[in-house]
Amino acid sequence: VLSRLLSLQQADAAFPSGSFAFSNGIEGLVAGDPAFDTASLIRTLTGLVRFRWAESDRVALILAHRAAPDPARLGRIDAAVEAAALVEAMRVGSRRNGASLLTTHVRLATPGADELRAAIRSGPMLGHLATVQGALWRALGLSEPEAAAVAGYQLVSGTVSATVRLGQVGAIQGQQALQAVLPLVAEIAERPVPEEPDDAIVLTGFTPLIEIAAMRHARADLRLFAN
């Protein structure tokens, strides 16, 4: 029961993870499509989960969960995340969000958080969000499926929240979109992830519309979110 409660704590929007500052590309999409609605949001969430999170961030998180607290192995997973993130705004955002989450856990005295911060400062690690999540949540006692479920939920709920804050959909419509994609998140969170050697960590993702929108968003004069 404790691990479930800790999972709820980590997934809670009130938990200071720093994710409120990031829209996962949704602000750029909305700016380019005034007709963006609930159906558009569901399609976007589905694409994020199926074509980026499933085989990129989720895989990195699971591998980091297994590797913790080995900083060398975590650093190689971080390097794979860096290589897989083609858009600078998303790449930098991942590191910034990872740093924010880690700072909170350092202040909460989560086991291993100080060592993770030292590994990032000294060089073996870059501190991408998925890597930090996997290492920290293992230290809290979350299982691999629990950690994946929390990360998947944070991705979709954070994207929904950003869309609501942008005024593009209402709160009820946002929750309808969230409900529509949760079964997909649950199914993917339970998929097995094979162990991969350091020289063969493969993270794949293909979300071109979101990535193009994020690149345009990075040059916008007025922005509510960091990406």
Enumerate the predicted regions with their spans.
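Metal- and O2-centered redox machinery and metal/ROS homeostasis
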Residues: 1-227
